[in-house]
């Protein structure tokens, strides 16, 4: 018995040292193939943060290792990937996802497996409200918050004929629900004269824009983004949709969606987004400079 105790005592420092050398693995899953314009800059920011954490000593004296997987923008694939990260890679927790429906699927997985999930991008409020669970947390303002940011300005303009256009999936449906509800509370006199819900990533921009033109709105609420937004803006400019209608668009101020518009960028829109060149706090200046130095590019 005594030799065994002595051996354990002798080996203890080496066991502790070996444990300290083992990195803490965390799992990240996202729709890199589906939305590279948004998620490649995101990935660069994630890698920069990981490098900074490890350079400063890691977490609890251990390096941080991020195991990255692509979820193909599909709820079923995302759950399969999440299971692989937890069961095979033995990560401490998982984070990421882009689409709201994918985020909800992974949140349900986290609940069933009782593993921490930090949703990086999904905006649907259901993620932490209606369908929330104690294992799921979010990084970004939800759809309710994003919409509420614009409602006061929308109400103050005094426009009464509103048209709606939003992608036909969880995020778009949630945005429409909250905008109509919040605006109607502040302005009971508004009417919604047209509503278009194109499939995500497959907008028939000509037909959608013409339907809105025919409805003669004096204001438009949109939650389109990415290529759907580009096509909508192009057709809207061509058909004069924005000439007599003020536009409120969630996320159109995100550089990933704003920059590709180039000379077609409309003026006077009310948007939410990330004005990376205008935020002048010490923390953001440090981040912006570090990102530029590491990647020779601006953050977005």
Can you annotate each of these PLM segments?
Residues 235-300:
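Extracellular/periplasmic periplasmic-binding protein-like sensory domains
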Residues 23, 38-44, 58-127, 139, ...:
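Beta-alpha junction/loop-to-helix N-cap segments that form part of ligand/metal-binding clefts
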Residues 85, 89-98, 118-120, 163-166, ...:
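Periplasmic-binding protein-like
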Residues 80, 125-126, 133-238, 275-286:
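Extracellular/periplasmic Venus flytrap/periplasmic-binding protein
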Residues 4-16:
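Bacterial N-terminal signal peptides
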Residues 27-47, 69-76, 98-99, 168-173, ...:
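Extracytoplasmic "Venus flytrap"
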Residues 18-22:
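Boundary at the C-terminal end of the N-terminal hydrophobic targeting segment
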Residues 44-66, 184-190:
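Signal peptide-proximal N-terminal region
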């Amino acid at each position: 018995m005594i030799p065994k105790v002595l051996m354990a005592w002798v080996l203890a420092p080496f066991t502790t040292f070996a444990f300290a050398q083992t990195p803490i693995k965390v799992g990240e899953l996202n729709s890199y193939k589906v939305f590279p314009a948004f998620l490649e800059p995101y990935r660069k920011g994630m890698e920069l943060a990981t490098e900074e954490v490890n350079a400063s000593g890691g977490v609890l004296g251990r390096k941080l290792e991020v195991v990255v997987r692509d979820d193909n923008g599909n709820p079923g694939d995302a759950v399969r990937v999440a299971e692989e990260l937890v069961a095979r890679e033995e990560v401490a927790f998982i984070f990421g996802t882009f689409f709201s429906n994918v985020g909800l699927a992974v949140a349900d997985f986290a609940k069933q497996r009782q593993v921490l999930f930090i949703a990086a991008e999904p905006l649907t409020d259901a993620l932490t409200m209606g369908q929330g669970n104690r294992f799921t947390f979010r990084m970004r303002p939800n759809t309710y918050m994003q919409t509420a940011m614009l409602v006061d300005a929308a109400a103050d303009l005094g426009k009464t004929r509103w048209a709606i256009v939003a992608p036909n999936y969880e995020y778009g449906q949630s945005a429409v629900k909250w905008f109509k509800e919040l605006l109607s509370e502040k302005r009971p006199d508004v009417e919604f004269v047209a509503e278009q819900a194109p499939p995500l990533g497959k907008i028939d921009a000509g037909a959608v824009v013409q339907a809105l033109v025919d409805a003669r709105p004096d204001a438009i609420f949109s939650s389109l983004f990415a290529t759907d937004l580009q096509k909508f803006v192009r057709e809207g400019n061509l058909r004069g949709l924005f000439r007599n209608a003020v536009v409120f668009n969630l996320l159109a101020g995100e550089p990933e969606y704003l920059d590709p518009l180039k000379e077609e960028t409309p003026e006077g829109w009310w948007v939410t987004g990330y004005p990376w060149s205008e935020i002048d706090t010490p923390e953001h200046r440090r981040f912006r400079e570090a990102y530029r130095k590491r990647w020779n590019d601006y953050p977005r």
